[in-house]
Amino acid sequence: MVQKHRASALHYDFRLEAGSVLVSWAVPKGPSVDPKDKRLAMAVEDHPLGYARFEGVIPEGEYGGGTVMVWDIGTYRLEGDESFDEALRKGRIVFTLNGKKLKGSWTLVRTGDRKWLLMKRKDRSAAEVDIATAKPRSVLTRRLLAGIARDEGGDVVKAATGDPS
């Protein structure tokens, strides 16, 4: 699942369920469906499974304070014979997404301690389109970030900087 998160800076939280947690990466530019793009994905702490459908406002001053949108949701399956834990330890996770927005084959490759690259693999779901701009709304509520902030008592002006112009 992917959450669009307007905290101190706009980023996308890319999360894969593994056991009893959501293994998570912060992707500053958001995912790209263009196989030519390599997106930085910074490993962050695991999150509880209950966070998968959180959409709302985290109060300013708390960790991650800002507006959160459920930008994409779906399932994934690993490609190959390795377990998730083994692929994570080796620093190369190859998987197929079946989300509302993101589909097809993807790879996460570790390039440093916490640094990974998120890449779309060439397949029929690949495209030369900015998916984040083309499909900016929540998959749960169809709201933009500013709408979520308005409805949940957050900073509408700050949240709106994460919405398309």
Enumerate the language-model features and the residues they cover:
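A charge-rich, low-complexity, intrinsically flexible signal that marks solvent-exposed coils, linkers
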Residues: M1-S165
